[in-house]
Amino acid sequence: MAEITVGQLAQQTNKEVSTLLKQLKSFGIEKSSEKDTLTPEEMKTLLDKINSAKNTVTRKKVTSLKLDGKHKINVSVKKKRRVAKKVEEQSPAKVEESIVEKPQAAVDVKDNKAVESVERNSVNLVQPQQEKPVTKPVIKDNGFKITAMPEVKIQENNSQDEEKSSEDKSTESKNNKKKSPKKVFTESGNNTNTKYKREEEEKKSKAKKASGKGFKKANPRQLSQLAGDLESFDEFGSKKGKLKAPKVKKQEFTMPVESAVKTIEIREGITVSDLANRMAVKGAEIVKVLFNMGVMATINQSLDQDTAVLIVEEMGHKYTLHNENALEEAVTTVDRSLHKKISRAPVVTIMGHVDHGKTSLLDYIRKARVVAGEAGGITQHIGAYSVKTSKGAITFLDTPGHEAFTSMRARGAKSTDIVILVVAADDGVMPQTEEAIQHAKAAGVPIVVAVNKIDKPDADPDKVVGELAQRNVIPESWGGDVMFANVSAKTGEGVAELLDAVLLQSEVLELEAFAEGLAEGVVIESRLEKGRGPVATVLVQNGSLKQGDNILCGTEYGRVRAMHDDLGKQIKVAGPATPVEILGLSGVPAAGDDMVVIENEKKAKELAAQRSQRQKEAKIAQEQSLKLSNMFSNMGKEGEQQTLKIILKGDVQGSVEAIRESLLKLSTDEVKVDIIASGIGAITSSDVTLAVASTAVIIGFNVRADSAAKKLAEVDGVELRYYNIIYDLIDDVKKAMTGLLSPDMKEQIIGIAEVREVYRSSKFGSIAGCMVVEGAVKRTNPIRVLRDNVVIYEGTLESLKRFKDDASEVKKGMECGIGVKNYNDVREGDQIEVFEVIEVAKEL
């Protein structure tokens, strides 16, 4: 506690210096002037003296109880109370002024810390005061209270003070019981009552003078304490106990709490409700923020990460972006540091235009009749084959050449090391040839050109070389880096040179792979077979795939139950650059998905579910964007767009994907193709039920409907169509779309009549006497009136007569009378043109 002068203490307590010096002298502290300083020991002595100055006051209270009749009983209760004794007598006016006046500003001390303000409190004159330690911040006196210095850290404890005061009350009440009688019976009750009233009036007047201006209303805490000391008696004078004082609610002040700043983890595609739950706010608040940002959203709508980040920052929280690929990177990353690389066989993809002899060339190399098994001689899906030659093994991928199989060609180019571009010597470069060149260059794969069908009389290999050179495929003989080989798939001419070129190119590439460790690869093709389940053709690229391994292919997972090579033989292990068929997946994977072996089946299942959920969210987001784009594209268009709904079932994933893309490309502004469902396997009853509900046509490509589905289709009238060749399927769909088109209305002139003379008729008005100069005039057809080759009226005929007889038709070179309905301004020299409206079918 720092030292303080007498003048500073007098200024803070609003006392005169002389008065304060007298009080200090009465407490044994000798000070002569206002400049004298008070040491901490003297301040402590002053506070102790103030707290010890107490006095005990006994108060007597008499109450009157009524009995039966006119009898009364006077009850006298005495109560003691300890009251702080005044240091000196002061006038009431001064007391009131000291209560109202507010303390002055705090006085600076040596340590530059403000001394807390000192206030006077008259309540201390009435209420008993407990002795408090020096460390308390507030110590009450008769006329003032002194706050502690700032360097002493003290916290006031109200609850302890209340407990002490309650203990004092209990001790006082016990003393009252011992010293004063409980009941006093007297006959002179009236005299006692008048005496009691005088005492009460004197006490009230004293209390009013002492209370001051700031305490006109009674303190609830004082009332409750007084009520607790009163004892109640029944009508017979027996004690009932103390009256219960009502509980006084204390007004508490709650400090304002800062809003908690949370760190929100944001994943891609998070919904509005999920984001609201993570921020512990209502979903409507998020919707409001989005609305202010100009985005109309519902509580179940998905948000992209950027929008969610803006919302979190707007609401004052922090964020962390969730790494969607964390689990995938941890599971699919294979440690190859302990494994050694070995040379592997090249993976060669045969590409080119349709019917240029790709599969026939591969057939000659494999010495097997593959083309005979393909419908129409057209490759419907990728075939993966491993061929052993005298100079080494080669893995071949045969891709379709039809334009519908663009994605399959791109997939083949991505999975390959070398591309054999087959070009027919008689056809030259065709559209799919150019597309194959683009796929190979995009994948960065070297090209070996095979000029096929050189055995034909009209073959012109030099023409092919020139056309390819125009497309930046330069042969080595011209100074380029592309090897050319003239071959004949029918006779086998030049096939050996082609294989030598492929093996030479593979040596230049120095192809290597890891033969050990967990296998990695790519799905070439997949299908659903009856009795075997999902079957996937997989090309192993690294490691060894073994029977019993846990694999993950896209969104599907499973254990390898069986493996077969390209010849159909069951094998146990497949090394790099080996195509195999595997069984045991949970579903049919998409062609082009990566295949990876995972040691933990639980993690494989979890990752597959995560990929499936991500795919579903992406699909929903795409549908929402498509709906919005369709809404804007359809604005201002008249009429409704016709829709051809199709349910597509196929034998393999690649064919279904290719047909789906081809059919969707047929959509126009007037007719739209909608593939409402597609899948692999036979047509089932559920497909027929879906077709009935959606009024769709079922198309099967290399699949048939089972017996139950056939019966249900006959009953419900659902159309089933089967195809083996993609050309026929696309042509029939085009015809069906043409049938849905609304026909064009075309006007055709069938006759012209010249007005030679005009007659007046009371019945029909003006009658034109005409000569038919072209075609024929028919009674029921619409007409136009032309004057100087300008249409002045369009309507119908009211009458057509040949002489006096009605006629339905008047041919060229004959005269007739024509009455035009609702038109009388026909003049000589006008022409009456007769026409008819015919429907013309639209074409796609």
From Swiss-Prot:
Residues 488-490 are annotated as: G5. Keywords: Cytoplasm, GTP-binding, Initiation factor, Nucleotide-binding, Protein biosynthesis. Residues 120-132 have a biased composition (Polar residues). GTP binds at residues 352-359, 398-402, 452-455. Residues 377-381 are annotated as: G2. Residues 205-219 have a biased composition (Basic residues). One of its GO terms (cellular component) is cytosol. Gene3D superfamilies: P-loop containing nucleotide triphosphate hydrolases, Putative DNA-binding domain, N-terminal subdomain of bacterial translation initiation factor IF2, Translation factors, Translation initiation factor IF- 2, domain 3. Signal peptide: none annotated. This is Translation initiation factor IF-2. It comes from Francisella philomiragia subsp. philomiragia (strain ATCC 25017 / CCUG 19701 / FSC 153 / O#319-036). Residues 398-401 are annotated as: G3. Residues 161-175 have a biased composition (Basic and acidic residues). HAMAP family: IF_2_B.
